Amino acid sequence: MNGEARSRVVDQEAGSTPSTLRDEDHPSRQRLFGCLPYDIDLNPLRIVMAELVGTFILMFSVCGVISSTQLSGGHVGLLEYAVTAGLSVVVVVYSIGHISGAHLNPSITIAFAVFGGFPWSQVPLYITAQTLGATAATLVGVSVYGVNADIMATKPALSCVSAFFVELIATSIVVFLASALHCGPHQNLGNLTGFVIGTVISLGVLITGPISGGSMNPARSLGPAVVAWDFEDLWIYMTAPVIGAIIGVLTYRSISLKTRPCPSPVSPSVSSLLR
């Protein structure tokens, strides 16, 4: 069997359409610039960009609903905030879920690295992309709507202790469901996955909004804090979601008797997307 035939067999076994592209012709291995003497693998780059763009969409949507309400002279309604966060997650999951997994949240990335089989080597890349996306979205939101960045920030409405524990508990609920979708018998929900994730995000915002501002995401809180240069009580939103996410994964693995990490989904290559 020649090389072309073997390539067709491998493609058919993988469920993709047959392709006669050589390795050096695959878009994921092309040279970005002709002056470079080596090929660059585009897969890590596009995964990082997917997380950055996805987090940008999520954060800009949040900035939009907060700013629009502020400009209209009203107060941000909890239901509007929850629906906006949930719908934006639905959009992003369907847009980039097949590329990066659509974590959009450093706490989810860390929790899946600890217990879910996600490679630690990619954790810094994901967190950097998520933080940059949230910060860029806040900057754009401030410029577009002409508001102060501090209205995007998350602050405890009651005590720091209450905010800490409500963020921890809500994040554990969100990640508990995410673990079930990733590892459980319902991992093949197909087109319903995005709506399920978006629904639980909305639930989390409804639970946490009156107490902590509804973050459950270190990047979502860090972006506005950096732009406003106000880091008061930021430690709550940096630590509680991470601890809660780890508890969520650990709880699911304990009650489902999972003894091994769930396999991390393999992101498709650029070449397979373009065939």
From Swiss-Prot:
Residues 1-26 are annotated as: Disordered. It is found in: Membrane. Expressed in floral buds. It holds the Pfam family MIP. The chain crosses the membrane at residues 47-67, 76-96, 127-147, 161-181, 192-212, 231-251. Residues 1-11 have a biased composition (Basic and acidic residues). PROSITE patterns: MIP. One of its GO terms (biological process) is borate transmembrane transport. The modification Phosphoserine is found at residue 272. Keywords: Membrane, Phosphoprotein, Repeat, Transmembrane, Transmembrane helix, Transport. GO terms for cellular component: membrane. InterPro entries: Aquaporin-like, Aquaporin_transptr, MIP, MIP_CS. Disulfide bonds: none annotated. A motif (NPA 1) lies at residues 105-107. A motif (NPA 2) lies at residues 217-219. Its main location: membrane. GO terms for molecular function: active borate transmembrane transporter activity; channel activity. It is a multi-pass membrane protein. Aquaporins facilitate the transport of water and small neutral solutes across cell membranes. Belongs to the MIP/aquaporin (TC 1.A.8) family. NIP (TC 1.A.8.12) subfamily. Aquaporins contain two tandem repeats each containing three membrane-spanning domains and a pore-forming loop with the signature motif Asn-Pro-Ala/Ser (NPA). This is Probable aquaporin NIP7-1.
